Curated annotation (Swiss-Prot):
Keywords: Ribonucleoprotein, Ribosomal protein, RNA-binding, rRNA-binding, tRNA-binding
Name of the protein in question: Large ribosomal subunit protein bL27
Organism in which the protein naturally occurs: Escherichia coli (strain K12)
GO biological processes: assembly of large subunit precursor of preribosome; cytoplasmic translation; cytosolic ribosome assembly; positive regulation of ribosome biogenesis; regulation of cell growth; ribosomal large subunit assembly
Molecular function (Gene Ontology), one example: tRNA binding
Pfam families membership: Ribosomal_L27
UniProt keyword annotation of Protein transport present: no
GO cellular component: cytoplasm; cytosolic large ribosomal subunit
SUPFAM superfamilies tied to this protein: Ribosomal L27 protein-like (SSF110324)
Amino acid sequence: MAHKKAGGSTRNGRDSEAKRLGVKRFGGESVLAGSIIVRQRGTKFHAGANVGCGRDHTLFAKADGKVKFEVKGPKNRKFISIEAE
């Protein structure tokens, strides 16, 4: 009789769902007000002109225009702003 003894249990075998973070609209792209530009954890990118910051640090356009990425300030922070077309 070909029998296989039962395998033991394991405490592994789980993984969380991907959160789909990252830049959604790149520099030079046209956006409409309300469009999500970046989904992020913390402030890797900061909100510049015509850009709002949600409570989960999502950056979104407050006006229609083109996305502009810039590095400024003494700490070389990355800012995202919207230039009106």
